[in-house]
Amino acid sequence: MRQAEVTRDTLETRITARVDLDGSGKAAFATGVPFLDHMLDQIARHGAFDLDIRAEGDTHIDDHHTVEDVGITLGQAFARALGDKRGIRRYGHAYVPLDEALSRVVVDFSGRPGLHYFVSYTRARIGSFDVDLAREFFQGFVNHAGVTLHIDSLRGDNAHHQCETIFKAFGRALRMAAERDERAAGAIPSTKGAL
């Protein structure tokens, strides 16, 4: 069973993330940041992961700690659910359009955290959501899932569309990378024998 539950409890946030990598896209979110909930739903639906994320944070200050810590906690949950990564595809990629916007996401469950984020949003906020926080979410995920992640917004005039294509592509790329590779016969996908 490729499932995990992780709780992160700090002076700034308390977050619980549950993930089932072999789910069907069932999702439940209560982070206190509505736009983040909307983006997390994209990961669940397009990744076909069952996700349940609950967060309480110091959103009276701003949303930064909550968004970043949700990324951290979700990254930890993915790492735990994947275990030694035996038998997974390891690499995943996706291009996703939404009207005029197009994004590409490429992921490698390499064990080496690295975020390469090339996104120029057309405005600083989507509703009340600060677009800089999307990067903070992904940085938290990358650092704690141990993945190399390339995110490119290739075009877009609408910041909401840009952000949504990124999260949808992220879900699809994660799905591909985390899938079991029947041809690998349970091997660790590395010539080193470890990830």
Curated annotation (Swiss-Prot):
* InterPro entries cross-referenced by the UniProt entry: IGPD_sf (IPR038494), ImidazoleglycerolP_deHydtase (IPR000807), ImidazoleglycerP_deHydtase_CS (IPR020565), Ribosomal_Su5_D2-typ_SF (IPR020568)
Which locations, inside or outside the cell, does it occupy? Cytoplasm
Which pathway does the UniProt entry assign to this protein? Amino-acid biosynthesis; L-histidine biosynthesis; L-histidine from 5-phospho-alpha-D-ribose 1-diphosphate: step 6/9
Pfam families per the record? IGPD (PF00475)
What is the first-listed, main subcellular location in coarse terms? cytoplasm
Q: Which family does it belong to?
A: Belongs to the imidazoleglycerol-phosphate dehydratase family.
The record's NCBIfam families line, in alphabetical order, gives: PRK00951.1-1, PRK00951.1-5, PRK00951.2-1, PRK00951.2-4
Protein name as catalogued = Imidazoleglycerol-phosphate dehydratase
Species of origin: Aromatoleum aromaticum (strain DSM 19018 / LMG 30748 / EbN1) (Azoarcus sp. (strain EbN1))
Coding gene?
Answer: hisB
